[in-house]
Amino acid sequence: MFDRSLMQRKADVRGVYPNQINEELAWFVGQCIALYVAKAAQNSQPRIIVGRDGRTSSPALYSALVQGIASTGAVALPCGLATTDMVQWGVGEQLDGAIAGVMITASHNPPEYNGIKSVLRNTATGSLDMISPAAHLASIFDAGAASGAAAAPACAPFASGPNLKLQERFTEAACDRSVSLA
C-alpha cells in the first residue's frame, strides 16, 4: 500500500521509503508514466530511459518501475546507476530512440527518502518537459483504479541485457565537447 497523496506533487513523487514510497508505488508510477508518454507522443511503444541513484532503496524501486513501464508495452531502457543530468542528456540526445526518461532519486533529501522524477522530449522544440504527477499522472492512475486495472501489480518481463552504458556515453560526449571548446 502507498500514500495516494504523493501523486499530487507537481515535480516528482517523493517520500520516506518504505512507508510512503515503495515498490508498489514505483510499479504504478512506471505504468502511468509509460501510458502518459505513449499518449503524448502518439507512440504505442515509447522508449524510456530509466536511471537510479546510489540510495539503498533505489535498486528495488528501479526494478519495480521498469516492470511497470514494461507492463504497458513500452520499452524501458535501463541504465543503472546514473545522475539526473545523465538521464536528461540521454533523452535530449534520443539515445537508442528514447523520448522520455525517469530517474529514481530524492536529490538532496536525507537517505531515508527516495523519489521518482521524469521528463518527456518535446518533439516541436527538442526541449525536455517535466512530467508532473499532479498534472499528468494522477488522472491516469485514478482511471486505472476505477476500472480495476490498478489492482495488484504483476511482474512484466523486461530486457536484462546490456544497459545503455549511459555513464560512458555521457563522459565521452562531455570530453568531446571540452576538446572542441579548447
Q: Where are the model-predicted features located?
A:
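Hydrophobic alpha-helical segments
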Residues: A26-F28, Q67, Q94, V119-N122
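N-terminal small/polar loop signature for handling phosphorylated ligands or for N-terminal nucleophile
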Residues: L35, N43, R47-Y113
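An N-terminal, well-structured beta->alpha segment
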Residues: M1-Q67, S71-T72, N163-A182
